[in-house]
């Protein structure tokens, strides 16, 4: 099965929600809680004519609404618009932010991933309550940022309110657009 426009995916682990700990503790029982939806998908098929690097079997980090269920106007639980059938979903190329190909995570333009810097590291800006504001380390750049001279591991400054947190391989990362990177420090 192939789509002319969409990636055909299934949720990693066959789970729509990632709302339990390794010990079985339920973190959230609400279907409306976007913070516990599964954010990872396995590629079943790429779009017809797709010429990129992603192949079936690769893992995508997807938008929180891809696998989410909702309650309609009548109170009936329904899948969101990405659902195709059973555990199969169709996603557009703007609904994934990172992909794992040959064991390596990569970011497609216009997205990149920045690791926040905690206050234990040296920095000019210090906030005793959390991570350094508006500063991080470029964890996964993209071809556009690389063409501008940035590389993974560079310390960067980014625009306020541009960070959107994900947990990738146990590490907190901010997904943001390439245009949100302001300065290489």
Annotated model-derived regions:
Residues 1-185:
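Acidic-enriched and Gly/Ser
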């Amino acid at each position: 099965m192939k789509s002319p426009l969409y990636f055909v995916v299934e949720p990693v682990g066959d789970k729509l929600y990632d709302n339990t700990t390794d010990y079985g503790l339920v973190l959230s029982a609400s279907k409306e809680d976007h913070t516990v939806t599964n954010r990872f998908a396995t590629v079943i098929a790429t779009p017809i004519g797709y010429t990129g690097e992603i192949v079936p079997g690769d893992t995508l980090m997807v938008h929180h609404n891809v696998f989410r269920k909702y309650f309609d106007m009548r109170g009936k639980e329904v899948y969101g618009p990405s659902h195709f059938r059973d555990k199969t979903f169709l996603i557009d190329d703007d609904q994934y932010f990172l992909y794992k190909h040959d064991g390596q995570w990569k970011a497609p333009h216009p997205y990149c991933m920045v690791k926040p810097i905690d206050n234990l590291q040296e920095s000019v800006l210090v906030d005793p309550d959390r991570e350094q504001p508006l500063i991080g380390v470029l964890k996964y750049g993209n071809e556009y940022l690389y063409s501008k001279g940035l590389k993974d591991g560079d310390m960067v400054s980014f625009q306020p309110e541009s960070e959107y947190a994900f947990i990738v391989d146990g590490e907190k990362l901010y997904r943001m657009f390439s245009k949100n990177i302001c300065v290489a420090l």
